[in-house]
């Protein structure tokens, strides 16, 4: 509303009982003239992973060029075997050089979300009155031994990011908001416990992005389309 309000009065009407057959995540935009008569309308759907689609054509409303020539893991694996290169090197071959600056920003955002989540306490926004628990689990896990500690810390890191998402904090969709804690938790733990360099983390993110893109191209990363495992399973 803040974006459109300067041009004309804006009202958002929620209709939770209306089910749109094309996709559950839909929004109808209606424009009215000064007399309140409808002048135009547009229905668009958020189909997951940042993609928008219209019911008539089902295609993305934003046309973006293909970055990767190969769209299956089999093709990419064969390329890696043929060239002796890794998955992240395939990403390097296809992307522009600024991809590494972008992934650096992604990594910084992930780390910040973990740290904020571990430091924050209190009740999460919403009617359920759920308390944040990441900091408690982190303290508990720190007292465990060996493998139990490792698993406990990863869980605490993932929960920290998920709680940041639930409170409206800045997170990275990996590949979605619903699964935003898994990838940063694993990478954060690897850097803390195994001293992985930022370079190795960025290569891991490039690989993760490649795999996520393959799934999005051939199946779905949308929980609304394919259930929660489309999000968490891909992560």
Regions found by a protein language model. Name each.
Residues 2-153:
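C-terminal regulatory domains involved in ligand/effector binding and gene-expression control
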Residues 1-12, 203-235:
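A structural-propensity feature for long, helix-poor, extended segments
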Residues 53-55, 173, 183-186, 228, ...:
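Basic, gly/Ser/Thr/Pro-rich low-complexity segments located predominantly at protein N termini
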Residues 97, 101, 105-224:
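Accessory "access/gating" subregions that flank catalytic or transport cores
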